[in-house]
Amino acid sequence: IETPGHSRAVILSLKNRYNKYKDIDPAKAEEFVVWDTKDTTNYISVQGYSDNVLNLAVPGTYRFVKRIIDELESMFNQAGVKLKTVHLGGDEVADGAWDNSPAIHEMMKKNGYTKIRQIEEYYIDQITEYLEAKGIKAGAWQEAAMKHPADFDKKVAKRIQSGRSNSRRS
């Protein structure tokens, strides 16, 4: 799976799902909202999109990613095979993708974060912890595993396998 960037198909599909259920089952509609409805950020990804990054400050993002992991695990189990690794992506998140997201700014304030990178670290921690509890290793591109504080690196290094991407993001 590719998160939080490269998620345009997910976002567009989940917006259609939201519109399908918003009037008949609002709770179901809200379950997988992976965007901040009040976000006014304008960004362009290296792929040329302005709508391809999951918002890491909304609960629907975590519910959705965990559901995908659960579904993958179920499919592997049905095939009689252990799911050993899930690659989370982590590369090519457009610079400034969350600049005007009230949800991001609220999360930063609530948690005492001073950098957006700390929200990305929170996301990596939450999802790799979820995978670890299931006995599944996490994989990610190098960007997801670099430039973190030493204590975070130690914590996550045992959970994540990293590889290089061709991203232009530093």
Each language-model region and where it sits:
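Substrate-binding cleft/loops of secretory-pathway carbohydrate-active enzymes
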Residues: 8-18, 139-169
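Substrate-binding cleft of carbohydrate-active enzyme catalytic domains
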Residues: 1-134
